[in-house]
Amino acid sequence: IVPLESGVYEDAISFMILGESLQVELSDGTRTELKDTNQYIGFSGDNNNPSGILLKNNNLHLEIQIDKDHNIGMDDLAGIKDVLVESAITTIQDCDDSVAAVDAADKVIVYRNWLGLMKGDLKETFMKGDFEMTRSLNPDRTFTSKDNKELTLPGRSLMLVRNVGHLMTNSAVLDKNGNEIPEGILDAMFTICISKHDLEKTGNYSNSRKGSIYI
C-alpha cells in the first residue's frame, strides 16, 4: 500500500531522511524512495537513524517501527520490529447489561471506568502467568514532519459511550416516591458530566478532536 520506487521492503537494510524525502537503502547497495513521495509524512528519532517512519495511505497513517535490539527487529535486515496501522474505528465503552452492570455497585464501577478514560488516568495491574502486567491508555505519538515541524497524532482510538435504553430502570437512584428512575437518564447524566473532563481538557489526554461528546 506504500510501495517503493524500486525494490521491496524485505530487502531494505536502512532508512534515512534527506530533506523532505525518505531514502531506503537496499541490500544490493542501491538506494530508493517511495513511489509516491507524498505518502511520506515524518519520522521519529534521528534523521540518519530513525526509530519510526510515518507514512500515509487513504488518509490513514502507518508507522514503521525500527529497533535492531528488539527480539523481532534483530531478525530483520533494517531492524523493523513492527508496523502500526491507524484505525478508523471507534471503541465502545458500555454501560449496558452486556458488562453485567445491573445494580448501584455495578454502575459505580462503570462510571468510575469512564471517568478514568476521560481523565486519561485509568490503569489496571494484573498477573498473567508469572508476570505482572499493567494496562493504561497509550500516550499521543510525536513525530518530526517532512517540513521539520512537530507533528502529534493521537495514541488512542476515539471512544464513545453506550448508555442503557430508556425502558430499563435501576435501583441506584430512587425518586421521592421510592420508585427506580429510568436507567438511561441516569447514564446520560453521569456520562455527560464525566465527559466534561475531555471537553474542558482537564485530563492527561484528549478523546475528541472536535470538542464533542460521543454517546
Region spans (language model):
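Catalytic alpha/beta active-site cores
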Residues: 1-214
